[in-house]
């Protein structure tokens, strides 16, 4: 070690465990002259120089102390050349320069150190910065010592563990080798015993007599450890491996002793180690390959490595384990479909065995092939496992079947749906109740969206759902009827019962909800409420005035007449129904409408039917999921919670769900994502199955095109809300015929984007925007690609324009008009003209340029046009009945006397849907 006073001491213990230290790296401090009497202490790393050759080492003459009268001045020790260690029988080893030189060098060592200590001149005291640098360097050195000590302890512990493992492996190999030798002894029993014993007896003296030291061609350094066999008894085992500790300590001792000539100190010679016998081929194959052992062997080929030995042991261990291995029977969970590879993993069987079993059953499959649950169950049972079949739809279990706590049930507001025919005043009636004006904001004066509102009457809340009355919005009316408690059927007193009125009655009956009839527009002179009541009887709606149980109220939305009576009738019906809900449970409900807002993202209008919905909860709505970011009521205010029968807008969904989907609150995001992915995958599978069913094979497609000639009108539809998209698609489906139909390439809620333009360009489709517009990028892309974008805000106009465009795809109707018949009397062959038929018109007339058919024996031989029509030698336009004429066909001359010529006119008429 090196201290700050440059006092170097050398400790050479007899035996010390080899540890990892920085090789030749120490830290020291030097003083740097900064000029003008200033100095600076700098911490540097010093590296010891180790000579590689004996002649490189320069002997250092020690400083002789002052002579004493009793003892003569010591003589400086001269550096000795490195001598090879000689193995002696007694295990003793002598080194030149015995104990006397040791005593002399030992007694003179303190005097040499005292004389070698440098005596510098102190220029000035250290500054505070220099003291701090020294203190910091000292602390860093101490910290490094602690880390190195910890590292040495860890290395020592790891080395002990490895040594124990190696000893255990050697014991196992020794046992295996003993078994192999015993087997070999039985085989070689016929050989003479003396010959068998001669081999090991002759090997041992040879190994003992082998010279231990071995010189090399190049000069070796004094610090290099002489290569010799270990002297420890355990190292002389049959394997012939030297232990790492002794060899390392020996080399370390020699290395430490290499600097003895410089200090004039001699270390006691180590005892000589006996020579080791040469390793056999089997021992070399089992031994560990190192650089030292590889250089020590004399020309023998290198054997197996340690990794090869470990692989052999592992293979032997596996073979032993497989012999006594017992089959483990498991419970295998089988979904609806599973791959063979996954099935084999769940059974802990090899996929090859499963493939072999299937081959025996006559099925050639690969590990990646998908099989159904029935075949998977057969395979699992055949391999002895028990089967538990599950369905993918099990992920939806427990969402909507939660039971309500009877003790927590409280009264809730009724949900009322306004239904009826278009333009019968449904929205106007609701506006009069809400004291709002929604009708003025509706395009065309008709409702094209489903809306939900909540009003309060005498301290009681009532939730109203306004549904469209147009024929295109059948699905909306059906959803409104399913999510409601009471249906208010609005019938105009001047228009009576209409088709959508009948449809609304059927929806209410199918949903099993009571009906309250509101006879509107009684302020008109032509109003006839009694006629309305009588017509309702035909559809099994019996009002109270006719002896039934259905409440009816005559109202006027325009003059706001009897609106309070209508609300009282609704509250009376709700009291009869005794509507209750549990607000403490998790929320469930129905999606009334969904849209994609540019600033807020996906927005869903929902009706909470059970429980209480709060911001921050995770919900699943259809195939979409999300965390509720905000709740907005019908007035546009943010609310902290939504109780039963309360309509709110939800922000935070990942996408726009379909109108009519049910939503529920789930416990965590993973469950919500799992349910959403399952539903999306199910929707994709259905779409693929639908397309596959429509597409069929190539032969079916060609036959359909040849027979039916079906033409498609591709469209990309974007609307403001999901319900409008649904209504538009339903209306366009009704326009389709056997020859032409509308094909919706893509539909969705939201503005027209650049991706829609790309899709329309790829499919050669037109783009329809309903209450939405295209952004600037989409408009630029459409102009560049030549894609037409049509904007609409009334569904009537949209359907009419698409109908007209689809009519243009219809092939025109071919209408044929019979003109007359002519009989060929004689055929003339005229030069430069060809054959000309002399005919007499026997029926109707014959016109020039009309279509003709040549009929022979009641069989049509040719169909074409007339080339010439002459009466005598003059060209005429037509020949009436009873007159004779000459006719020639275009590109046809196979005419004979007695044939009949049929003349007709063809007209093409444009068709409409």
From Swiss-Prot:
Residues 1-322 are annotated as: Disordered. The keyword Nucleotide-binding applies. Residues 466-469 are annotated as: G3. One of its GO terms (cellular component) is cytosol. The keyword Transferase does not apply. GO terms for molecular function: GTP binding; GTPase activity; guanosine tetraphosphate binding; translation initiation factor activity. Residues 131-180 have a biased composition (Basic and acidic residues). Residues 420-427 are annotated as: G1. Residues 520-523 are annotated as: G4. Keywords: Cytoplasm, GTP-binding, Initiation factor, Nucleotide-binding, Protein biosynthesis. GTP binds at residues 420-427, 466-470, 520-523. Residues 60-113, 181-195, 203-238, 261-277 have a biased composition (Low complexity). Residues 445-449 are annotated as: G2. Its main location: cytoplasm. InterPro entries: EF-G-like_DII, EFTu-like_2, IF2_assoc_dom_bac, IF2_II, IF2_N, P-loop_NTPase, Small_GTP-bd, T_Tr_GTP-bd_dom. Residues 556-558 are annotated as: G5. Residues 411-578 form the tr-type G domain. HAMAP family: IF_2_B. Belongs to the TRAFAC class translation factor GTPase superfamily. Classic translation factor GTPase family. IF-2 subfamily. One of the essential components for the initiation of protein synthesis. Protects formylmethionyl-tRNA from spontaneous hydrolysis and promotes its binding to the 30S ribosomal subunits. Also involved in the hydrolysis of GTP during the formation of the 70S ribosomal complex. This is Translation initiation factor IF-2.
């Amino acid at each position: 070690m090196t201290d700050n006073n440059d006092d170097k001491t050398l400790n050479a213990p007899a035996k010390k465990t080899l540890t990892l230290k920085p090789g030749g790296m120490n830290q020291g401090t030097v003083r740097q002259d900064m000029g003008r009497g200033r100095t600076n202490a700098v911490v540097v790393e010093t590296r010891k120089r180790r000579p590689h050759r004996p002649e490189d080492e320069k002997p250092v003459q020690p400083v002789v102390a002052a002579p004493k009268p009793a003892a003569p001045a010591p003589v400086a020790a001269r550096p000795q050349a490195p001598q090879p260690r000689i193995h002696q029988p007694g295990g003793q080893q002598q080194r030149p320069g015995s104990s006397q030189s040791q005593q002399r060098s030992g007694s003179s060592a303190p005097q040499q150190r005292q004389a070698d200590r440098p005596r510098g001149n102190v220029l000035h005291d250290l500054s505070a910065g220099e003291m701090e640098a020294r203190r910091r360097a000292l602390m860093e050195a101490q910290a490094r010592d602690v880390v190195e000590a910890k590292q040495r302890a860890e290395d020592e512990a790891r080395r002990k563990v490895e040594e124990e493992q190696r000893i255990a492996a050697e014991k196992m190999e020794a046992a295996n080798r003993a078994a192999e030798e015993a087997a070999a002894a039985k085989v070689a029993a016929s050989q003479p015993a003396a010959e068998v014993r001669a081999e090991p007896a002759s090997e041992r003296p040879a190994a003992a007599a082998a010279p231990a030291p071995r010189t090399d061609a190049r000069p070796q350094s004094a610090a290099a450890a002489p290569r010799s066999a270990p002297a420890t008894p355990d190292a002389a085992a049959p394997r012939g491996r030297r232990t790492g500790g002794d060899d390392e300590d020996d080399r370390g001792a020699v290395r430490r002793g290499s600097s003895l000539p410089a200090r004039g100190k001699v270390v006691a010679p180590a005892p000589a180690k006996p020579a080791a016998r040469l390793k056999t081929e089997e021992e070399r194959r089992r031994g560990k390959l190192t650089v030292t052992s590889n250089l020590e062997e004399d020309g023998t080929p290198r054997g197996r490595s340690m990794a090869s030995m470990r692989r052999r042991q592992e293979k032997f261990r596996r073979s032993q384990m497989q012999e006594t291995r017992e089959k483990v029977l498991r419970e295998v969970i089988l979904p609806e479909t599973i791959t063979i590879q996954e099935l084999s993993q769940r059974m802990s069987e090899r996929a090859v065995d499963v493939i072999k079993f299937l081959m025996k059953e006559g099925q050639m499959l690969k590990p990646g092939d998908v099989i159904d649950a029935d075949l998977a169950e057969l395979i699992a049972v055949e391999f002895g496992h028990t089967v538990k079949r599950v369905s993918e739809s099990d992920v939806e279990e427990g969402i909507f079947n939660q039971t309500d706590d009877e003790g927590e049930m409280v009264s809730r507001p009724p949900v009322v749906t306004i239904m009826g025919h278009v333009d019968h005043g449904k929205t106007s009636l609701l506006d009069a109740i809400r004291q709002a004006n929604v009708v003025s904001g509706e395009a065309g004066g008709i409702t094209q969206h489903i809306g939900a509102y909540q009003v309060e009457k005498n301290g009681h809340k009532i939730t109203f759902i306004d549904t469209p009355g147009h024929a295109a919005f059948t699905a909306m009316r059906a959803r409104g009827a399913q999510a409601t408690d009471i249906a208010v059927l609005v019938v105009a007193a001047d228009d009576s019962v209409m088709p959508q009125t009948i449809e609304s009655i059927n929806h209410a009956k199918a949903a099993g909800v009571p009906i309250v009839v509101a006879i509107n527009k009684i302020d008109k002179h032509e109003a006839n409420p009694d006629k309305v009541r009588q017509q309702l009887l035909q559809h099994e709606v019996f009002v109270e005035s006719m002896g039934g149980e259905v409440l009816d109220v005559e109202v006027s939305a325009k003059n706001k007449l009897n609106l309070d009576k209508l609300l009282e009738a609704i509250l009376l019906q709700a009291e009869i129904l005794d509507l209750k809900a549990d607000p403490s449970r998790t929320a469930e409900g129905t999606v009334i409408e969904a849209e994609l807002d540019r600033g807020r993202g996906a927005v869903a209008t929902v009706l909470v039917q059970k429980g209480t919905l709060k911001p921050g909860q995770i919900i699943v709505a259809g195939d979409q999921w999300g965390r509720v970011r905000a709740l907005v009521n019908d007035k546009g205010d943010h609310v902290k919670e939504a109780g039963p029968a309360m309509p709110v807008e939800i922000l935070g969904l990942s996408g726009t769900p379909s109108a009519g989907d049910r939503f529920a609150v789930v416990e965590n995001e993973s469950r919500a994502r799992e349910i959403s992915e399952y539903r999306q995958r199910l929707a994709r599978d259905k779409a693929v199955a639908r397309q596959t069913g429509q597409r069929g094979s190539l032969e079916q497609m060609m036959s359909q095109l040849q027979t039916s000639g079906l033409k498609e009108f591709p469209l990309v539809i974007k609307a403001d809300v999901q319900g409008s998209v649904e209504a538009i698609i339903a209306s366009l489906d009704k326009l389709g015929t056997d020859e032409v139909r509308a094909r919706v390439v893509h539909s969705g809620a939201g503005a027209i984007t650049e991706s829609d333009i790309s899709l329309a360009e790829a499919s050669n489709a037109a783009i329809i925007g309903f209450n939405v517009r295209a952004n600037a990028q989409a408009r630029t892309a459409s102009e560049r690609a030549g894609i037409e974008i049509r904007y609409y805000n009334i569904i009537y106009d949209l359907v009419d324009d698409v109908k007209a465009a689809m009519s243009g795809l219809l092939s025109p109707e071919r209408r044929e008009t019979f003109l007359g018949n002519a009989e060929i009397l004689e055929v003339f062959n005229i030069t430069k003209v060809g054959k000309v038929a002399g005919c007499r018109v026997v029926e109707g007339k014959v016109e020039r340029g009309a279509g003709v058919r040549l009929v022979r024996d009641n069989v049509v031989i040719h169909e074409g046009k007339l080339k010439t029509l002459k009466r005598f030698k003059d060209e005429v336009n037509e020949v009436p009945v009873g007159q004779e004429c000459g006719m020639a066909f275009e590109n046809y001359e196979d005419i004979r006397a007695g044939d009949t010529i049929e003349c007709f006119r063809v007209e093409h008429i444009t068709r409409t849907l």
